[in-house]
From Swiss-Prot:
Effect caused by changing residue 350 to N: In strain: 777-3A
Further details from the record: Encoded from partially processed COB mRNA that terminates with the in-frame coding sequence of the third intron.
Membrane topology of this protein: Multi-pass membrane protein
InterPro entries attached to this UniProt entry: Cyt_b/b6_N, Cytb/b6-like_sf, Cytochrome_b_N_euk/bac, Di-haem_cyt_TM, Homing_endonucl, LAGLIDADG_dom
Record-linked Pfam families: Cytochrome_B, LAGLIDADG_1
Compartments, record wording: Mitochondrion inner membrane
Membrane-crossing residue ranges in chain numbering: 32-52, 85-105, 116-136, 146-166, 185-205, 225-242
One annotated Gene Ontology cellular component of this protein: mitochondrion
Purpose: Mitochondrial mRNA maturase required for splicing of intron 3 of the cytochrome b (COB) gene, containing its own coding sequence. In vivo splicing requires the formation of a ribonucleoprotein complex together with the imported mitochondrial RNA-splicing protein MRS1. The complex seems to stimulate the intrinsic ribozyme activity of intron bI3 through binding to and stabilizing specific secondary and tertiary structure elements in the RNA.
Entry superkingdom: Eukaryota
Protein name: Cytochrome b mRNA maturase bI3
Cytochrome b, as annotated region: 1-169
Length: 517
């Protein structure tokens, strides 16, 4: 007997490839199924090797693909094999489906077989789309946005499903991490479904006798497939949890301390002083330490940027019912984790101290947090002092004041163009206000060389407005020349402000308005 027939392993290959009995009416169209299997193996193998070098991080995805093409040995061959293999996979699949339609493979008794093939086809389309999203760029970004927005057509829960798929209100890191993970799982699911497909073919084409032994064999095989599926989905859950953890932590330097040299943290400090809070509240007999910022819903993108920069906290939406019955939507970013507060927030505010009287709140907050005060009864009485923490000169001498000021403007400033009554020409206006912060307002006035007076109302809210040509010029030049830029809705307001400013002769003739920001 030939060795290929006597060997336990080779005999299996021999029975299916060499000595496999086939009907005389079979033709070359029946090669499509085996070619599909070959294409799938090529896709899985090349995909595994490329995944070793690919990063699903939103900032590294495109660079990692470039790394595969340029730095990985024969990486370009892997990528081209993967890309062209996908094209051939679909070409062969469509020919395979056309053969099935032509020969009536969808009719009884092969209905189940055809349905399994349809499921494989749908899974393949989904897998191809996920791979299309992995290279983070404009095309994949908007392609993913459009396709996933299809779920918004589902009544009642559509928008929630879209937000869940995105991992937030825009394309966040978890979305692209999940794309990569889901793609790998779907590849294995296609492989498993193809095994089912093959088993059903055996049942139909070889006229298997449904005796007790064969039923046991089929039962065992399907249980094995169920175990494989369960393993893959458990692996997916673990990977998604790990991905969520990695996307909600921040990178430390070698000494495990936050690197606060980036002036963007001064910007965040100014933003918190404008619209943020830092509190110790009672939760039963325990204390809840919290730092947060609340803004209008239009600034939700800004809060997500802050979350991504810090790597901690969460963003939520809440609806407020106004006195007139209308609903106002607000978004909130807050941090409650003590380790995050100690290791990230405190180093930032130690490096860039608050300039308003909120610094008293911070010192009280920091003292209790570092002492690990847990119970409400152990908390000492606190009342914010009235005396200013910093003088105007102290504020102006801070080397981070310009970066801090951009963040403060993001929260508390307003750019507007309006037409006064009985006047033909429009007027530009810049306004900034804050409660219990006269020294900060005086520092801003001095720093920007604004001549207008500061108005303080009976609630101790200080407001400064400038409409003069020189004042508007100083504000525009400061914002445009600052290395730290506006990041939220205020940026859009400022861009529209510049656009309208170019149409006002008295400003346009006096100084050169920046063409872009």
């Amino acid at each position: 007997m030939a060795f290929r027939k006597s060997n336990v392993y080779l005999s299996l290959v021999n029975s299916y490839i060499i000595d496999s009995p086939q009907p005389s009416s079979i033709n070359y169209w029946w090669n499509m199924g085996s070619l599909l299997g070959l294409c799938l193996v090529i896709q899985i193998v090349t995909g595994i090797f490329m995944a070793m070098h690919y990063s699903s991080n939103i900032e590294l995805a495109f660079s990692s693909v470039e790394h595969i093409m340029r730095d990985v040995h024969n990486g370009y061959i892997l990528r081209y094999l993967h890309a062209n293999g996908a094209s051939f996979f679909f070409m062969v699949m469509f020919m395979h489906m056309a053969k099935g339609l032509y020969y009536g493979s969808y009719r009884s008794p092969r209905v189940t077989l055809w349905n399994v093939g349809v499921i494989i086809f749908i899974l393949t389309i989904a897998t191809a789309f996920l791979g299309y999203c992995c290279v983070y760029g404009q095309m994949s970004h908007w392609g993913a946005t459009v396709i996933t927005n299809l779920f918004s057509a589902i009544p009642f829960v559509g928008n929630d499903i879209v937000s869940w798929l995105w991992g937030g209100f825009n394309m966040e890191d978890p979305y692209y991490s999940n794309m990569m993970l889901n793609k790998s799982v779907l590849c294995w699911n296609i492989f498993i479904w193809m095994m089912n497909y093959y088993i059903i073919q055996l049942i139909i084409y070889n006229n298997m006798i449904w005796n007790k032994n064969n039923m046991v064999k089929m039962f065992i095989m399907r249980r094995k497939l169920a175990v494989i599926n369960m393993y893959m989905y458990m692996k997916l859950i673990i990977q998604r949890t790990y991905s969520y953890y990695m996307n909600n932590t921040i990178i430390y330097d070698k000494n495990h301390k936050l690197n606060t040299d980036n002036p963007i943290y001064a910007y965040i400090g100014g933003l918190f002083e404008g619209d943020g809070w830092i509190t110790i509240s009672k939760k039963g007999k325990y204390l809840l330490y919290e730092l947060g910022i609340e803004m209008h819903i239009r600034d939700i993108q800004l809060l997500y940027k802050i979350k991504n920069i810090l790597g901690i906290g969460k963003v939520t939406i809440k609806k407020l019912k106004m006195k007139d019955g209308t609903i106002k939507e607000m978004c909130k970013f807050n941090v409650r984790n003590k380790n995050h507060l100690k290791n990230i927030i405190i180093p930032i505010f130690d490096k860039y101290p608050m300039l308003t009287n909120k610094h008293y709140d911070y010192l009280y907050f920091k003292d209790n947090l570092l002492k690990d005060i847990k119970y409400y009864n152990d908390l000492s009485y606190y009342l914010r002092p009235i005396k200013p923490f910093n003088t105007t000169e102290d504020i102006l001498n801070k080397n981070y004041f310009s970066s801090w000021l951009i963040g403060f403007f993001e929260a508390e400033s307003c750019f507007s163009i309006y037409k006064p009554m009985n006047k033909k020409m429009k007027t530009a206006s810049f306004e900034v206000s804050q409660n219990n912060s006269m020294e900060v307002m005086l520092a801003i006035k001095s720093y920007l060389k604004i001549t207008q007076n500061i108005y303080t109302d009976k609630f101790n809210n200080s407001r400064m407005t400038t409409k003069s040509i020189n004042g508007i010029k100083n504000v525009v030049m400061f914002i445009n020349n600052n290395p730290i830029k506006l990041l939220g809705y205020k940026k859009l307001q400022y861009l529209l402000f510049l656009k309208d400013l170019r149409t006002i002769t008295k400003y346009n003739n006096y100084f050169k308005i920046p063409p872009k920001y």
